[in-house]
Amino acid sequence: MIIGIGIDIIELNRIEKMLDGKLKFMERILTENERNVAMELKGSRLTEFVAGRFAAKEAYSKAVGTGIGKEVSFLDIEVKNDERGKPILITSTEHIVHLSISHSKEFAVAQVVLESSSR
């Protein structure tokens, strides 16, 4: 059973501006594992990567109904890719998490669907 849905869209140029102070912003948004991946990227690919993770984490927080804040922080959520490149959201929830991330020339968008783990 679906118990939550969240979606977030972010302008890539907004993230690009925040990446000027690259390390501080990335430390606030990305886990250590995500930062390690990000450090290997440059230019528009770095912007897309960070924007996609930002949108995914915001979408997850909306799906659980709290938003980013006291109960859920950016660092409580990690996005990895499986062996085929599919984004996987890692968090402490018991629920099944479905994540989709997409980019265009100007935007990154992510959608999260939370499903009850009991059938």
From Swiss-Prot:
Cofactor: Mg(2+)
InterPro entries in UniProt: 4-PPantetheinyl_Trfase_dom (IPR008278), 4-PPantetheinyl_Trfase_dom_sf (IPR037143), ACPS (IPR002582), P-Pant_transferase_sf (IPR050559), Ppantetheine-prot_Trfase_dom (IPR004568)
The keyword ATP-binding is assigned to this record: no
Alphabetical list of Pfam families matching this protein: ACPS (PF01648)
UniProt main location, coarse: cytoplasm
GO molecular function annotations of the record: holo-[acyl-carrier-protein] synthase activity; magnesium ion binding
Catalytic activity: apo-[ACP] + CoA = holo-[ACP] + adenosine 3',5'-bisphosphate + H(+)
Gene Ontology CC, one term: cytosol
Top-level taxon: Bacteria
EC number in record: 2.7.8.7
Subcellular localization: Cytoplasm
Positions annotated to bind Mg(2+): 8, 58
Keywords of this entry: Cytoplasm, Fatty acid biosynthesis, Fatty acid metabolism, Lipid biosynthesis, Lipid metabolism, Magnesium, Metal-binding, Transferase
GO biological process: fatty acid biosynthetic process; lysine biosynthetic process via aminoadipic acid
Function: Transfers the 4'-phosphopantetheine moiety from coenzyme A to a Ser of acyl-carrier-protein.
Family recorded in the similarity comment: Belongs to the P-Pant transferase superfamily. AcpS family.
Protein name: Holo-[acyl-carrier-protein] synthase
